[in-house]
């Protein structure tokens, strides 16, 4: 690849959360990482009928659950929005990015209700749900704009980018 990185794609469904299937996903993730590859996880839309029935795919929660299964330190959700704003940035020019969320409060959930992404169907509310899953699993989560891959460098250099949801309430 252009960056000399190997990736492996995992196509999963919500049924990975069943106890008898978790171990298979954990083993696959561990093996991918042992081989020095980067796991790329997505919902398997070809077999997931829930998406058709609900008219909404939900990769954010799936990613959070996989992060918990993998005992990850951090989950990065890349979107076309910079992170969580104090109000919908598509409607309000004065919307301000919230850089750190130490606790997911009802106010945070209410703010997220109106700030959707134009990519995918989950919007910000599903990203907050994913942040809750991560927090319960002891994992930090960052929501950031993924249109520029150089943004990842800021994460790796511990520079602020997007919105950081902390697992333990500390930065």
How would you describe each model-predicted region?
Residues 1-171:
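C-terminal catalytic "cap/lid" subdomain
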């Amino acid at each position: 690849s252009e960056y000399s990185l190997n990736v492996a794609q995992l196509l999963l469904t919500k049924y990975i959360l069943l106890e008898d299937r978790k171990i298979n996903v954990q083993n696959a993730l561990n093996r991918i990482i042992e081989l020095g590859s980067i796991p790329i996880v997505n919902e398997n839309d070809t077999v997931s009928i829930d998406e058709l029935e609900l008219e909404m795919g939900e990769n954010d929660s799936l990613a959070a659950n996989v992060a918990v299964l993998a005992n990850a330190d951090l989950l990065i959700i890349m979107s076309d929005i910079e992170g969580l704003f104090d109000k919908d940035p598509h409607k309000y020019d004065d919307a301000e990015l919230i850089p750190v969320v130490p606790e997911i409060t009802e106010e945070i959930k209410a703010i997220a209700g109106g700030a959707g992404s134009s990519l995918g169907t989950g919007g910000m509310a599903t990203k907050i749900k994913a942040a809750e899953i991560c927090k319960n699993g002891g994992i930090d989560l960052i929501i950031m704009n993924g249109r520029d891959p150089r943004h990842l460098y800021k994460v790796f250099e511990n520079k602020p980018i997007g919105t950081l949801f902390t697992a333990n309430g500390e930065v």
